[in-house]
């Protein structure tokens, strides 16, 4: 080792977990690491010009260990960390990463991820896709796509975030030129977080409106109803608070004039809740009841995330499990109703001829891709709070299967009630089936009015929607907050993370106000159709290419083996390299070929609105090439090819976040020079230096003399 290399190298001997530091017995056992925090000991003797650095450091270590100075130093170091807030409570003593924190236990992570993946789409989109694409036959391509695309991508994102212990921006130290992928994920999460909370606020509004003896959308005798209203129930027979029976003449009138007549639930939704304007450009007034519910929704999200994953991890014990209780209650009630079996058979009866249609496979792939939350950044973020050796392979399988099983289960709940409604009206199930907001706020609420004690069932249904939405919203907000905090990375923002969460929540509330106007539903559906559509496919495809082919599949497989103790199974290796990217490309092509201009009921969106939608979609995708060009301009290199190589190779700080996990090829050997960006203290003439490596290299304790 040359003299220049010895200027800041330090010794880090092996440590015994149960008995504290163990002094090395030979220079070969000394590992040289960069200086991060320094404690100073009195001058030592024994180092001569002919003595090697390792031998000198070894003598210092033996002297400090045998004299008891080293344990005192380590105790003082721990005390200083505690005083600085690094060890604030007994809970964090269980954390591996004192800087960022970890989940309280593994159940919290699994429940949070289940709540993130299982959202409103499982209830209002999957059942509709299933019956439209061949009923039970749709299950075949659905689970094929789950096995070959869904679970592999889910595992990739979980392992990516867990290995680096960073959010969707920090993980791109793996290949800095592709950091734009992380920014694209942030943009997507921002869009979804804005409009998703508006859907939750509408569910809050319906929940509060259900706290009444008679549901306000049950009859046509309200001030907002028109002459075209024809309900299943006849308000004229409402006497002494009794529930009327549907009159055959009224039903006949409703069915014969279905094109001209509207249901009371539809008029309640369109004329009272939304006060819908006639055009997307006509904002009208802000609906104050919805604005208030939006504030409640954002307040709930903020309070649940006020301490990051420490608080949200406790909330999900309820928010991620109670929806299953409600689903089970609604299922038991639904299957006992007359006509429920017809609805379930309509949902499950296979039409095998549709398996040969490309559209069915495209819908199956798209539903798997979107329902699991891939490329949103949330999976990477949630996994970044795992402990390093957590078995994320097992978690990815459990969570993915739970998500898909929930979708199938929700289909039974939805179609049992819709079958009852169709039987009551004497029409085919297809006449009452719907998806999206039309199912959640029109069709299903109307079906609930036919049940005894209908307000109770309505309360349960909308409470379930609220919890399903909040589970996803927690992760969307945490994705943005974690990305900001990790990117800044200093001690101040770590201590002020609550204020960052508050700032993001307030910004989300303000940006959501236009969606509570009379034209709000038009903008909500525009964002839903464009902001998180093909852009997710592009982001996910580039992520696969960057990890598997730029960073290298062998490197990534070795990383996973170091983290989990075993390499990814051969099936996942093949899927990551070939199958999943091919499926993603198929989804992208299918999305382009099957593109149709957006409509809402019979309203056709104008060209300028569609253009805004495409701009929203492109805004997340363009982050990738724009940041790549920026990175190339900032990277050293004599030629473009050299710059490209330097910009795509992993940065110096890529790898496990904690030094105790940086083994093998990640184990540092020689301290970098000051020009590498590390601060190296000069050797002091009158005292020897034994640097004690801390958990945060950006801050340094003061001179400590013993």
Curated annotation (Swiss-Prot):
InterPro entries: Na/ntran_symport, Na/ntran_symport_glycine_GLY1, SNS_sf
Single GO molecular function: glycine:sodium symporter activity
Keywords annotated in UniProt: Amino-acid transport, Cell membrane, Disease variant, Membrane, Neurotransmitter transport, Phosphoprotein, Symport, Transmembrane, Transmembrane helix, Transport
Main location: membrane
Start and end residues of each stretch annotated as Essential for interaction with EXOC1: 695-706
Chain positions found as Phosphoserine: 673, 698
Disulfide bonds: none
Compositionally biased residues, Low complexity: 7-18
Side Cytoplasmic, residues: 1-108, 631-706
UniProt topological domain (Extracellular) ranges: 209-285
Membrane topology note: Multi-pass membrane protein
GO BP terms: glycine import across plasma membrane; glycine secretion, neurotransmission; glycine transport; neurotransmitter uptake; positive regulation of heme biosynthetic process; positive regulation of hemoglobin biosynthetic process; regulation of synaptic transmission, glycinergic; sodium ion transmembrane transport
Domain of life per record: Eukaryota
Any one annotated GO CC term: parallel fiber to Purkinje cell synapse
PROSITE patterns: NA_NEUROTRAN_SYMP_1, NA_NEUROTRAN_SYMP_2, NA_NEUROTRAN_SYMP_3
Subcellular location, record wording: Cell membrane
Chain segments carrying region Disordered: 1-26
Ranges annotated as spanning the membrane: 109-129, 136-156, 188-208, 286-306, 315-335, 360-380, 407-427, 450-470, 506-526, 530-550, 570-590, 610-630
Keyword Transmembrane applies: yes
Pfam family, one: SNF
UniProt disease link: Glycine encephalopathy with normal serum glycine: An autosomal recessive, severe metabolic disorder characterized by arthrogryposis multiplex congenita, joint hyperlaxity, lack of neonatal respiratory effort, axial hypotonia, hypertonia with pronounced clonus, and delayed psychomotor development. Some patients may have dysmorphic facial features and/or brain imaging abnormalities. Laboratory studies show increased CSF glycine and normal or only mildly increased serum glycine. Most patients die in infancy.
Family to which the UniProt record says this protein belongs: Belongs to the sodium:neurotransmitter symporter (SNF) (TC 2.A.22) family. SLC6A9 subfamily.
Main function: Sodium- and chloride-dependent glycine transporter. Essential for regulating glycine concentrations at inhibitory glycinergic synapses.
Subunit (UniProt): Interacts with EXOC1; interaction increases the transporter capacity of SLC6A9 probably by promoting its insertion into the cell membrane. Interacts with EXOC3 and EXOC4.
PANTHER family to which the protein is assigned, alphabetical: SODIUM- AND CHLORIDE-DEPENDENT GLYCINE TRANSPORTER 1, SODIUM/CHLORIDE DEPENDENT TRANSPORTER
Protein name: Sodium- and chloride-dependent glycine transporter 1
Gene: SLC6A9
